[in-house]
Amino acid sequence: DSRAPLLERRVVLSQYLMRSQEAQHYPAAETGLTYNTWYGKFHLEMVMWHSFHFAVWNQPKYLEWLLEWYRDIAFAPAREIAQRQGFEGVRWMKMTDPSAFEAASNIGSFLVWQQPHPIYMAELVWRTKTSGEAEKFLHDYSEIVEETAKFMASYVNYDAENDRYVIEGACAANESLDE
């Protein structure tokens, strides 16, 4: 296929850009280092888009760096957020800084789409481990998975009348913010 060199060039360039801008010991800003938007803050919902591909390209160490940040730096503030809001487990902030404290935002405290990311990130890295490495990995990161899941379970309420779980008080951002 005559397009193979172009595809290869694009893949190599993309990997270079992602490695140089996104693979670090802290989550990257929403737009990386090229452009500064959203106050240059880390946006945890972007971790999936910016970093999960490293597992597919056989570079899981970059995801482990992020898991270390979740465990060693962000875990305690995330637990405080969940407790302050009346939930179990850990609630990962939407927009943050290197110390993992919530950054000022008129909507960030209400968003939860970043919640499942540490669980999936841990699974992606775990799948790359040998059996001996996997046991240590589970020991090191199982609390992130368990406490994230606890928050997610405590965030919903069971509606017995309709036999379903609901997220109370949730509303779409475009329906609640002034235009």
Describe each region flagged by the PLM.
Residues 25-33, 137-140, 157-167:
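Short, glycine/acidic-rich hinge or "gate" loops at secondary-structure transitions
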Residues 26-40, 92-108, 167-179:
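Acidic/His metal-coordination segments adjacent to aromatic residues that form catalytic metal sites
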